[in-house]
Amino acid sequence: DMEAMSQSIGEFFRSESKDTLALAKIFKKQLDIQNEFEKKAKGTIAESFIKANKPHIPDGHENAIEYVRNLKDCYFSYIDFNDKTLQSSNFLSEKIISYVFGMTDENMGDLVSYRANIVDVFDAMKEAKPAIKISLLTILWQQMADLSLESTANYISDTYLLALAEKAQDKKLVSELTKFKTTSIGTIAPDFSLEKTFGDITTKTKLSALNTDNEYVIVFWSSACSHCMLEIPQLKEFVKM
């Protein structure tokens, strides 16, 4: 099957063999298997998946470096993002996630590679309808958020997703993206007014105007929260030390 062919190709390159004829036979067999699968699946639901999952199959000799490069370059070549059958499954989302995380460049840091791969993903689905772009980018954005890769999640939002959501008038998604960014680690906190009381004197100021100490602790709490009622007094005593 195709998985066995992929293993054979990997073993050939790892062995550093110079037998180009043997490699050509592997590629030929791989193409034959692909064509046979497509022929048998013609007219069925499986046809869309088999065609979309077709790997890069060289029609001539390629060394290991060329093969890996072309494997990445051709990753999306046979995928139709507007195919209703593919859209009805998780195939498209799994493919883009596998690409972003699996096709990293060892000469780059992971975060740099992720961003470069995200650009590739968006370019690959440039002909897709806006709703499909929003759906797939949201899944990718959520994946980054779940992995605490906040800067990458915000990159997806800032570069592509937020504009698409605004154009589609998806207020819920716009709100979610905006709230996530404003509460992300490293994001400058929004300024707000507050009161300072020393003895009987209360003065009004802003968060941005606090400059008498190197660090501040800002606590948001509620009298309806049992943990807050227990721990706020403890914090008050702690800061007196």
Annotate each language-model stretch with its function.
Residues 203-235:
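Short active-site neighborhood of thiol/selenol oxidoreductases, capturing the structured segment around
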Residues 1-201:
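Oxidative protein folding and maturation machinery
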